[in-house]
């Protein structure tokens, strides 16, 4: 999820949705789904997001509840899904899996205690959330029935989204992860799953504010710590930038301090030259099949109609109002 300390360095300004009309947002699909599953949909009634067979379907509620915000402001989302993971990312995934298993044990223990309050259980449930194959595949299918554009990344969806934005094929990246800055995303919208307006991280303004190159920003982040490495002891955002200014780059900093960060060059490459593709194509003129979408959510997966009907109505109304339905 990236190092939250990057926020200290990021140039961030509020971005009202009303100013986003006509834009295309390349959304990190896994990040967007995870936020909905852990912060939004989890607080609906429990039977609404789990089938009788125990399959989680909260993602379907999240898609239906989350899309109207885009369409009501004439914003086209393009959902970018993760592909494979690097060896270093696989190590991080394994660490998160181990941590999640510990939280799952705590959750089971909490449920067995009569005095455990609902807030504690909700917090533990959010920490044990995982994106299962079923969640990812049913999300793809629902987006397809709603004719919402999808791009398949060869590796990290966020890296692919940043690449698309740098090529001019998207106006913004949509992600809660501060690593979007390190991937060179020109403009990143955070808070797309919240009730209010999002905020926008500006890549070039961030570099200018701290007198850093893209490489320098990545080097500073590695010194602070990333998903792929522990940072140097006592090195926070201000110190990291100062060290890069004093020594020029990551290698020189490490040499001057007689220190080491394992796989530092590979980590740099993951941010500066990630696996991405130009082999994608999508149409922003959408043509939703609402009947098939409703059928998929409420009949195929058994989501209570009252949980999603207003969302479907808002999508349908907004598609008409914003002129996205070229077929009318």
UniProtKB/Swiss-Prot annotation:
GO terms for biological process: DNA repair; DNA replication, removal of RNA primer. Residues 1-100 are annotated as: N-domain. Its EC number is 3.1.-.-. Binds 2 magnesium ions per subunit. They probably participate in the reaction catalyzed by the enzyme. May bind an additional third magnesium ion after substrate binding. Keywords: DNA damage, DNA repair, DNA replication, Endonuclease, Exonuclease, Hydrolase, Magnesium, Metal-binding, Nuclease. Its cofactor is Mg(2+). Residues 320-328 are annotated as: Interaction with PCNA. It comes from the Archaea. Residues 120-248 are annotated as: I-domain. One of its GO terms (molecular function) is magnesium ion binding. Pfam families: XPG_I, XPG_N. SMART domains: HhH2, XPGI, XPGN. Mg(2+) 1 binds at residues 28, 82, 156, 158. CDD domains: H3TH_FEN1-Arc, PIN_FEN1. Belongs to the XPG/RAD2 endonuclease family. FEN1 subfamily. This is Flap endonuclease 1. It comes from Natronomonas pharaonis (strain ATCC 35678 / DSM 2160 / CIP 103997 / JCM 8858 / NBRC 14720 / NCIMB 2260 / Gabara). The lineage of its organism: Archaea, Methanobacteriati, Methanobacteriota, Stenosarchaea group, Halobacteria. The gene is fen.
């Amino acid at each position: 999820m990236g190092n939250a300390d990057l926020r200290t360095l990021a140039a961030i300004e509020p971005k009202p949705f009303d100013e986003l009309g006509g834009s295309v947002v390349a959304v990190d699909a896994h990040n967007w789904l995870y936020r909905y599953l852990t912060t939004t949909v989890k607080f609906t009634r429990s039977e609404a997001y789990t089938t009788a067979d125990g399959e989680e379907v909260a993602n379907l509620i999240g898609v239906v509840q989350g899309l109207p915000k885009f369409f009501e402001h004439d914003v086209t989302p393009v959902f970018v899904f993760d592909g494979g993971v690097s060896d270093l990312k696989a190590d991080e995934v394994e660490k998160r899996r181990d941590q999640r298993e510990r939280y799952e044990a705590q959750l089971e223990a909490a449920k067995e205690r009569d005095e455990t309050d609902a807030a504690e259980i909700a917090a533990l449930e959010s920490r044990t959330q995982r994106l299962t194959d079923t969640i990812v595949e049913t999300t793809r299918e629902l987006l397809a029935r709603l004719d919402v554009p999808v791009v398949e990344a060869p590796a990290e969806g966020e890296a692919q989204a940043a690449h698309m934005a740098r090529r001019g094929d998207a106006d913004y990246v949509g992600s809660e992860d501060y690593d979007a800055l390190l991937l060179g995303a020109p403009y990143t919208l955070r808070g797309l799953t919240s009730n209010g307006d999002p905020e926008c991280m500006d890549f070039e303004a961030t570099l200018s504010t701290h007198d850093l190159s893209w490489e320098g920003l990545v080097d500073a982040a590695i010194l602070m710590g990333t998903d792929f490495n522990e940072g140097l002891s006592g090195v926070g955002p201000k110190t990291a930038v100062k060290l890069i200014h004093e020594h020029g780059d990551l290698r020189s900093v490490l040499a001057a301090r007689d220190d080491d960060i394992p796989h530092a060059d590979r980590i740099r490459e993951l941010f500066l030259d990630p696996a991405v593709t130009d082999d994608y194509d999508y149409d922003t003129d959408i043509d939703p099949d609402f009947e098939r979408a409703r059928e998929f959510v409420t009949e195929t997966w058994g989501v209570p109609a009252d949980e999603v009907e207003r969302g479907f109505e808002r999508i349908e109304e907004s598609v008409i109002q914003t002129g996205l339905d070229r077929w009318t």
